A protein has these predicted regions:
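C-terminal extensions
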Residues: 1-8, 12-91
Length: 91
């Protein structure tokens, strides 16, 4: 089992997304930025993904970096504020 699968917000869909992105470990994930992963996933798959995918990326990166376990929806309000301000990932 990948150590990514041990992170709180990682299920089958997130594991599949990480595979598409080439992210194979928690250590590698810790060096990533959620914005970059989201934009890259959309580009590689040729489709815009639900913004909640970004929230999952943010939560898992946070856990990988700090060890603090937070639900993915904790990151939703800040993402929505960025979207409202026009500062969310440009695809």
């Amino acid at each position: 089992m990948s150590d990514l699968a041990k992170l709180k917000n990682v299920g089958k869909a997130a594991l599949a997304d990480f595979a598409v992105l080439g992210v194979t470990s928690t250590a590698q994930l810790a060096a990533c930025e959620a914005d970059d992963l989201y934009v890259k996933l959309c580009a590689l798959t040729g489709q815009r993904h639900d913004p909640c995918v970004y929230d999952v990326f943010a939560a898992t990166i946070h856990q990988a970096r700090t060890g603090e376990v937070l639900d993915w929806w904790v990151f939703t309000p800040s993402r929505k504020e960025r979207m409202k301000a026009g500062n969310f990932c440009r695809i």
